[in-house]
Structure formats: C-alpha cells, structure tokens
Design a protein with these regions (language model features):
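C-terminal active-site/capping subdomain that shapes the small-molecule cofactor and substrate pocket
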Residues: 3, 230, 242, 246-335
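Generic structural signal for well-ordered, non-membrane alpha-helical segments
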Residues: 10, 14, 104, 151-154, ...
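Predominant activation on well-ordered alpha-helical scaffold segments within soluble catalytic domains
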Residues: 14, 18, 109, 159-166, ...
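Glycine-rich beta-alpha junction loops
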Residues: 37-39, 125, 152-154, 178-185, ...
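A generic structural signal for well-ordered coil/turn residues at beta-strand boundaries
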Residues: 63, 128, 202, 239-241, ...
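Catalytic core of tubulin tyrosine ligase-like
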Residues: 170-232, 238
C-alpha cells in the first residue's frame, strides 16, 4: 500500500527527501503535496540544480499551484503557519516536517489536527512520541506514535557506530568530535548570529560549536546515557562530515576486533545503514552516499587494550534524508 506524503519546507533536507524518493524509484512513497515559503518557480530551480549533489535527473516543471516531477503534478502551497496547511484536503497521510523551525510536539500537533496521521521531523524534537535512529531503535515504534523525530544527521552516524561498539565491547565512557561541513545556519560573511562563532564567515575558518548528538545517544541507547560527550568543528566544506569517537571499554579491544565487528554488521543487520571501507579516501568521495555511517577502518586505532578511536564518514544531507524515508516505510508497515 502506497504512503501518501506531504513535505513542509524545501530547504536542504526537504529537497533531498524529494530526490531520495524519486531517485530510488520508491513505489511505496508518493508525494502528494509540498508547502514552502518560496514559490513553485524558485523551488523548481533549486531542486533541479544543486551545487552539492548535481543536477536532479528528473523531468521538472511547475505552474502557480504545482511542482511537476516526471509529469506527476504535486500540489504546492506557500503557507507560513502550519495551522493553515490542510493536509486532509491534499490526501496526505504522513508529513515530512523539514523546516527545522517547529521543534516541539506542541507546535507540530497542528499537522495532526489538519489531517496528517504521522509527522516525521528532520531535527531533534522536544516531547516527540519517539526519537528514532533507523538501524538502531526503530523497533521501539508502535502504531500509536504520531510525532516522530529522526534525530540529527550526526546522531544518525554516531548511534549505529556507538551501538556496535557497546554491544561488542561495553563502552564505559567516550568523547565524540564531529568535523562537520558548514550549514545554512552559518554566515557566508561575518554577520550577526546568536552564536558568536557561527556569526563568523563559514568559508574562512574552522568554527567550534555545540552538538547535541552525544547527549541524544542516551535517548536512543539508554544504557549509554551520561557516558558520551561531544563537540562540533564546522569546516569550510559544503557537505560530508566525519565523526571521531574516542572511547574506553570494559572488554579488551584491538584494531582487528573493532574492524571485524563493523565488517560483520555492515554485511548483515546494518546493511545499507552502515558501511566500512579500507580505502584511503577523503570527504568528497562520500558525497551522495546514502549510508548513515561509513566506518574508515584505516583510521581505527587503540591505546593499550581498553581505549580506542573509531572514525566514520557521513553525507550529512543525503544519508539522513534516506533514513527519514526508511522511518516512514517502517511506521507504515507496523501501523
């Protein structure tokens, strides 16, 4: 049975969700309606031509009230308040909330009141019914969950990596650094921002800033609550990021033991969510990679028998957008 979806917000993630659905030729998800503050002409141009992911290989057109993809007319609106989007009228069952502006259940319940059955949020969300990292804790979902957070791109990389380590070696504590591509929240040139570091030119500096990914792990994997901390270093690249997790374990570890554990799960239970590579690659080589985490086995290291470091690449746009679609399909299957 097809899932009829709507998308609120055509920023970086909203556009990538659309591309993920179309490029994968996913017959289980049908886009019925898009709401975006800019008009259909501007939205059509931005999804067709992308500076990071290249030209969208689809037949794209528009009129005043539609975005037309491969001759499929998708109704289009420009409501600034979610209370004004009538999802019921457009035949939408699931909403991908991709604005990044509505980050609490109290705000998002308006989607449900307007006809949506489920809302999948592209960001951390206060009081969400569930926060899900696909490949780690989707089995916690039930048919009554309505507001579902897909966490963040960094959490989607860190969680499966930490989970594999914890199951195999029992993490006692750890510290994560994400070397993260700059995002649209930063300034191209120095300008005002509530974070004085993000106020500085994204293309000229390494910008230390906060990340909630390490603390969010405790919500995803309760046995790791309070055991991880982290920081983000924004760097002057437009896409693809890298986590480095330094950790201490109860069980003895070695480079081979760690890499073998990831090789095993990449072929089985985490296939398509987690990959492992031994090639000596750089960030651009992982652009448009749909996995949540690509462990770089050449960077795995240990000190003694109980302290280690693991590195994992992730396309912070494309991988995350694909996991949002996976969550929608999983929820639909159990509902």
């Amino acid at each position: 049975m097809t899932i009829n979806v709507g998308i609120n917000g055509m920023g970086r993630i909203g556009r990538m969700v659309i591309r993920a659905i179309i490029e994968s030729q996913n017959k289980d998800i049908k886009i019925k309606h898009i709401n975006n503050r800019s008009n259909s002409e501007a939205s059509c141009t931005l999804i067709k031509y992308d500076s990071v992911h290249g030209k969208f290989n689809a037949d794209l057109d528009y009129d005043d009230n539609h975005l037309i993809i491969n001759k499929n007319k998708i109704t289009f609106s420009q409501e600034s308040k979610i209370e004004d989007i009538n999802w019921n009228k457009f035949g939408v069952d699931y909403v991908f909330e991709c604005t990044g502006k509505f980050n609490s259940k109290e705000k998002l319940v308006a989607h449900i009141n307007n006809g949506a059955k489920k809302v999948i949020v592209s960001a951390p969300c206060k009081n969400a019914d569930k926060t899900i990292v696909f490949g780690v804790n989707e089995d916690q979902l039930n048919k009554n969950d309505q507001i579902i957070s897909a966490a963040s791109c960094t959490t989607n990389c860190l969680a499966p990596v930490a989970n594999v380590l914890h199951k195999n070696f029992e993490i006692e504590k750890g510290f994560m650094t994400t070397i993260h591509a700059f995002t649209s929240d930063q300034r191209i040139l120095d300008n005002s921002h509530k974070d004085p570091r993000r106020a500085r030119s994204a293309s000229q500096s390494i910008v230390p800033t906060s990340t909630g990914a390490s603390k969010a792990i405790g919500e995803i994997i309760p046995s790791l609550k309070g055991k991880l901390e982290g920081v983000a270093m924004r760097v002057p690249t437009p896409n693809v990021s890298l986590i480095e997790l330094v950790f201490c374990t109860k069980k003895e570890i070695s480079k081979d033991k760690i890499n073998n554990a990831f090789t095993e799960v990449s072929k089985n239970q985490l296939k398509k969510v987690l990959e492992i590579t031994s090639e000596k690659l750089v960030s651009i080589d992982f652009n448009h990679n749909s996995s949540s985490a690509i462990v770089d086995s050449s960077l795995t290291n240990v000190v003694g028998t109980n302290m280690g470091k693991i590195s994992a690449w992730y396309d912070n746009e494309w991988g995350f957008s694909n996991r949002m679609c996976d969550i929608a399909e999983y929820v639909h299957k159990i509902s």
